[in-house]
Design a protein with these regions (language model features):
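Conserved "HGTGT" condensation-loop signature of ketosynthase/thiolase-family condensing enzymes
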Residues: 1-86, 101-106, 113-256
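Conserved phosphate-binding catalytic cores of ATP/NTP-utilizing and phosphoryl-transfer enzymes
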Residues: 94-102
Length: 257
């Protein structure tokens, strides 16, 4: 018997994406997500009225209780579109994509829009100017929360205050260095060589916050403007939170695409 052709209703595809960046105006995360979502939807206008679910990644910037609902309203989505926000976790963007693919494969979802944003630059600027925070709509019922709600650390970490990522990841890095027989300065060189190609991509990317190519030496060498943040990481090796950026993507079935 010949193999059965795959059901296009159950084959998940990523069909569109959008990004947003703001360096000047003061914005909130929903403002940025609107821009990113509109950019993604512009690539597939026929799917705008077919979105079944709108998922928003948890936001660190202070926002109202229902950013997904606020975003849905600003995008013109009807009440039939499911709105949700995730728990806290760096894994949640990929988890949302994986769950969307699984739901499409199971035949329970056709089109979903996934979005996330931070506006920490704007939040800090407002505070510095003595302005009130822009939390968006604050009079909405809270969005449903999805995802793993377990804390990201256990009693052992709490007991020794090993909580912030900038303390946790350097610990891993030092273990890797020790296993490889490398001192901290040699490990910095390895990390610099790993990260330098990413800066080359960023230098040509219109939505990169830092659009400068750096050499491995630039990244790995401690200097007054590239201080050691937590051994062995220099400042240029650490995550930067003070940006205003957003991204969105649309996952749908092959049939919908």
């Amino acid at each position: 018997m010949p193999p059965t052709a795959p059901d296009s209703e159950r084959i998940p595809v990523v069909i569109a994406s959008g990004q947003a960046l703001e360096r000047d105006a003061l914005v909130n995360p929903v403002d940025l997500m609107v821009r990113a979502c509109e950019s993604a939807l512009a690539d597939v206008p026929g799917l705008r009225d077919r979105v079944d679910r709108l998922s928003v990644v948890d936001i660190m910037t202070k926002v109202g209780p229902a950013p997904a609902t606020e975003l849905a309203t600003r995008l013109g989505f009807g009440d039939d579109v499911t709105r949700e926000i995730t728990t806290v976790g760096g894994n949640t963007p990929q988890w949302l994509v994986s769950r969307a693919a699984s739901d499409i494969a199971a035949g329970t979802l056709s089109v979903t829009l996934i979005a996330g944003a931070e506006a920490i630059r704007s939040s800090r600027a407002r505070r510095a100017q003595g302005m009130d925070r822009d939390e968006g709509a604050v009079d909405l019922a809270p969005d449903p929360v999805v995802g793993d709600d377990r804390p990201g650390f256990g009693p052992a970490e709490v007991a020794i205050a090993l909580l912030a990522p900038i303390h946790v990841y350097p610990l891993f890095e030092n273990v890797l260095a020790a296993r490889a027989g490398r001192p901290a300065d040699a490990q910095r060189t390895v990390i610099g060589e790993l990260l330098a190609p990413f800066t080359r991509v960023a230098a040509a990317h219109p939505y990169a916050w830092f659009g400068h190519e750096r050499t491995a030496v630039d990244i790995a060498t401690p200097t007054p403007d590239n201080r050691i943040v937590c051994e062995p990481y220099t400042k240029r090796m650490a995550a930067f939170l003070g940006s205003d950026q957003a991204a969105a993507l649309i996952v749908c079935s092959l049939a919908a695409a």
